[in-house]
Amino acid sequence: MLSPDMPLKNLDEYDRLGIKKKADAIARFIENRWDYLQKNNMIALYGN
């Protein structure tokens, strides 16, 4: 979590390491979940 007294010079480092890492983890989770559902035929893909 960003603290109000965090020096501005650290914000880029936080953004690069923290937010991007979290976004990548969420994206991987969604991709893995989608693959799992597709492999188990639990979702129907529209337009096929």
From Swiss-Prot:
It comes from the Archaea. This is Uncharacterized protein MJ0183. It comes from Methanocaldococcus jannaschii (strain ATCC 43067 / DSM 2661 / JAL-1 / JCM 10045 / NBRC 100440) (Methanococcus jannaschii).
